[in-house]
Amino acid sequence: MIDVAYKIVEKLPDGSYKFLFHDRKISFRLSDMLVAKNKMGYEAYNKDGSKKMYLTGIHVIETLELCLKYLKYFKRKDNKAIIFCDVMHVRKKPDGRAGVMLADTIILREEIFIP
């Protein structure tokens, strides 16, 4: 099943994009399909000291409104863009902020906002 979501990215001078945090060496363009390197990761620790494990994915945000809210946390906004994406195999990120999801596959459709 294909859903829609949004992704905040860094916009490069040549018009391509990069992830903000992980896999920053990878650049991509609109209409590209990106597939997550699914592996087990951890976000934090349980009270007993054990790691909270989860299946990783590509971070996406459920709504444009939440993207705009999260964009405010970045000091530099002039090189950011919000991309409308088709997303597949989406799940809530454990212990993530509201609306933050993990997708196994995203297709970058349209740049809808440049701050």
Regions inferred by a protein language model and the residue ranges of each:
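Conserved NAD+-utilizing ADP-ribose enzyme module
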Residues: 1-58, 64-115
